[in-house]
Design a protein with these regions (language model features):
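Beta-strand-rich recognition/accessory modules
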Residues: 171-275, 567-569
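Carbohydrate-binding surface patches
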Residues: 176-177, 186-187, 580, 628-669, ...
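Conserved, mostly hydrophobic/aromatic
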Residues: 111, 236, 281, 354, ...
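Polysaccharide-binding surfaces and accessory modules of carbohydrate-active proteins
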Residues: 23-25, 30, 36, 43, ...
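C-terminal beta-strand-rich structural cap/linker in extracellular carbohydrate-active enzymes
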Residues: 678-707
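Aromatic-lined carbohydrate-binding/catalytic grooves of carbohydrate-active enzymes
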Residues: 277, 281-418, 429-431, 439-443, ...
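Glycan-recognition surfaces
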Residues: 371-372, 376-414, 418, 465-595
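Short, well-ordered beta-strand segments enriched in hydrophobic/aromatic residues
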Residues: 96, 107-115, 644-652
């Protein structure tokens, strides 16, 4: 069918598999639909509506033509692109890009608006706000339950983003209440569906919203920042929307969650490295401990070649795969040059030590900083952030020469990506930790988020909206050049572009050390403090409670995409708590490795050695949980269809705990000393755990042929 030319009256089947079918009719009311074999209900979207040259134009299409595809991508997804001219504005063309696979019911699609060659028009905002409707969808077929799912509420108590769910009642539809999403799920008698968009922000800030109506419809519309007023559109300079997601499954919420989780793990991104369940070590907590507990007053004192090489050796004993050098390794931002005072032989010697152990290197970066004296700044002077006409002031980044904030929504993004590619090739860096990225701060008319024909406020909104799309472009450029590369976006503070968009390219660094004293209304003077600003920095159960909060996402989004670090410190009970926590997916270790006793190193090495034999199974398994985070007991079961996986039982009180697994299990590969495992007639495990004090019990299951 490649190149087939159709009138808009025909249905174009893009993917007619057992997983999903996507049809484009191109009509105003029936523009694009998603259906599922064996399910009567379908998701039908109306045509998008743009404001072009001051007039509202519905993008119903004439003469739809496939111009590309189906093209099979590396993640077993096929991409096709279809175009047609707008009936009501014939000099405009709309492209519809669809990604689908017979292996997942979740479909991604986006729109691209361009002009006919030799013509142009503008996207306008006659009412001084975004005038863009992405489509309306009838959800009347799913009346059992409708739920808004917010992924971006920042919880000050855990000092992390949290998942929350909000019912969308019939009264909400009657009163045309708007919901921010980014996901809405709807459940009927025999099927369930979801609608979602890929963007990012911290609630309640939103750039798009789902508007309900008494007719049982959802209209997804732009709120602000989706495009700058007077945005020129030509044949070469097309306007491209964000990606949207839709899915239908047989069953209910559990089946929908499992399908979406599998989509996020395998089919959402082409950058497969971000989904690998490596065990990470990061130097930052050791640097913090030295400043506050070592009384050095300096985050950088420990960071030198000798110390790093010693820590690499210990990390290898513990079972770490990726060793991340946090702030301290660079002499200046922008060019990201190694600090030769701390590392007189460069980082090549660290690279060689890591190679010897079969480990990988990671480094810290801030994409929004460039030293004034750097070559990067010289090449990208016009990309410096400005706000209200004032350039970013000069400031020092971790005691390095003066830097200025630089805008990623500008041509600079390519230069930054290419510099990281150079570093990756030189030092075998596969992991990039990105930190310090505020979503706000630039309204310059000289970048790629609006020009002088619109207002400062409009350009600032567009910067905030576009930031995550440009971050993803950087990640994708890096991963195209460095297969297996991983970019981790630190969202441990508020005001960052958290949502579904970045997950199409990378993963999140979810939690640092939890709340500050000030979050708990405890007076803390940042200027004169002599104690650590974080409350939960000690071994034991409490810090792990906070860091496990991100496991709430695991039902829908795999926990491997939310990196958290756990402490390997004695006593034994704390070691088990932290081991069990990181095995559930967050997969990080930090702290002062040189204070971990030999028996602790052996425990981590043995336990993580066993875990690595089943970690792919653990990552793929949908979670079963009994008890809330911090409860006693709090039980997590991660057993894959083949019976491999693990169970972790946390308890805060002395006494016995018994648990029967929901799934049949393979033989025991490794277990902690405080658990007895039996098997029932169905092959499920009966776990009898004994706790003398707060601790965790861990058991890992694996078939012999899996080892």
């Amino acid at each position: 069918m490649n190149g087939l030319f159709l009138t808009a009256a025909f249905v174009v089947a893009l993917a007619a598999t057992g997983a999903a079918a996507v049809d484009i009719r191109g009509d105003a009311a029936d523009f694009l639909s998603v259906s599922r074999s064996g399910v009567v209900e379908r998701l039908t979207f109306s045509a998008p509506v743009f404001e072009i040259n001051g007039a509202s134009v519905t993008a119903a299409l004439e003469r739809i033509e496939r111009v590309r595809g189906p093209r099979r991508l590396a993640n077993s997804v096929e991409e096709s692109v279809w175009t047609g001219s707008l009936r009501d504005f014939p000099s405009a063309r709309l492209a519809v890009t669809v990604r689908s696979s017979d292996l997942t019911p979740v479909v991604r699609f986006k729109y691209g608006l361009s002009s006919a060659p030799g013509t142009s028009f503008r996207l306008t905002k006659k009412a001084k706000r975004d005038a863009l409707v992405y489509g309306t969808c009838d959800v009347s077929g799913w009346g059992v339950a409708r739920t808004e799912m917010r992924f971006n509420e920042y919880d000050a108590l855990s000092h992390a983003y949290r998942l929350s769910e909000h019912g969308m009642t019939s009264r909400a539809f009657e009163n045309r209440i708007a919901f921010a999403g980014p996901m809405v799920r709807v459940v009927g008698e025999t099927s369930a569906a979801l609608l979602a968009y890929e963007s990012g922000s911290q609630a309640p800030l939103t750039f798009l919203e789902f508007v309900t109506a008494p007719e049982q419809t959802l209209t997804l519309r732009a709120v602000k920042g989706n495009y700058p007023a007077n945005r020129a559109v030509t044949d070469e300079n097309r306007f491209e929307t964000i990606w949207f997601q839709a899915a239908i499954v047989k069953g209910g919420t559990s089946e929908l969650a499992a399908a979406y989780r599998d989509f996020q793990l395998k089919y959402c991104t082409l950058n497969a490295g971000s989904r690998k369940p490596y065990v990470f070590y990061n130097t930052w907590a050791a640097q913090e401990r030295d400043k506050w507990w070592g009384k050095s007053g300096d985050y950088m004192r420990l960071m030198n070649e000798k110390r790093i090489l010693e820590d690499v050796d210990i990390a290898h004993e513990l079972g770490v795969d990726v060793f991340v050098v946090d702030v301290s390794w660079f002499r200046q931002t922008g060019d990201w040059i190694v600090d030769e005072k701390r590392f007189p032989r460069g980082l090549g010697v660290v690279r060689e030590r890591l190679r010897r152990h079969g480990m990988k290197m990671g480094l810290w970066f801030d994409p929004t900083e460039a030293a004034k004296i750097s070559g990067m700044m010289a090449r990208n002077r016009r990309s410096v952030m400005s706000f209200n006409g004032v350039e970013s002031p000069e400031h020092s980044v971790w005691s390095t020469p003066g830097s200025q904030k630089i805008c990623v929504v500008s041509p600079y993004w390519r230069d930054f990506a290419d510099r990281l590619i150079e570093i990756a090739k030189e030092l075998d860096v596969v992991y990039f930790k990105w930190d310090g990225i505020s979503q706000f701060g630039c309204d310059s008319p000289d970048h790629e988020h609006g020009d002088s024909s619109t207002t400062d406020a409009d350009r600032h909104d567009c910067y905030s909206f576009e930031q995550v799309r440009y971050l993803s472009k950087i990640v994708d450029r890096i991963c195209d050049a460095i297969p297996g590369a991983i970019v981790d976006f630190d969202v441990t503070e508020g005001g960052r572009c958290f949502g579904l968009a970045f997950l199409s390219s990378g993963k999140y660094f979810a939690t640092n050390n939890g709340p500050y004293y000030s979050n708990l209304d405890v007076p803390y003077d940042w200027a004169t403090a002599s104690v650590w600003s974080n409350v939960l920095v000690h071994p034991g159960p409490a810090r792990a409670w906070i860091c496990r909060a991100s496991l709430d996402y695991d039902r829908w989004i795999p926990s491997v995409l939310f990196l958290c670090h756990f402490l390997p410190d004695a006593p034994r009970e704390s070691e088990l708590i932290n081991l069990g926590s990181l095995m559930l997916g967050p997969s990080g270790v930090w702290g002062n490795l040189q204070t971990v006793p030999p028996e602790g190193r052996r425990l981590f090495g043995e336990a993580l050695g066993a875990y690595k034999k089943v970690r792919d199974d653990v990552t793929s398994a949908s979670p079963v949980r009994v008890g809330r985070i911090g409860a006693s007991p709090e039980i997590h079961e991660k057993i894959a269809a083949n019976g491999n996986g693990l169970v972790v039982v946390f308890a805060n009180e002395a006494g016995d705990q018994v648990y029967v697994t929901e799934h049949a299990v393979s033989p025991v590969l490794w277990q902690s000393e405080n658990i007895v495992v039996e098997r029932d007639a169905q092959g499920c495990a009966i776990l009898r755990c004994r706790f003398d004090r707060p601790s965790a019990a861990i058991v890992i299951f694996a078939k012999e042929e899996s080892l």
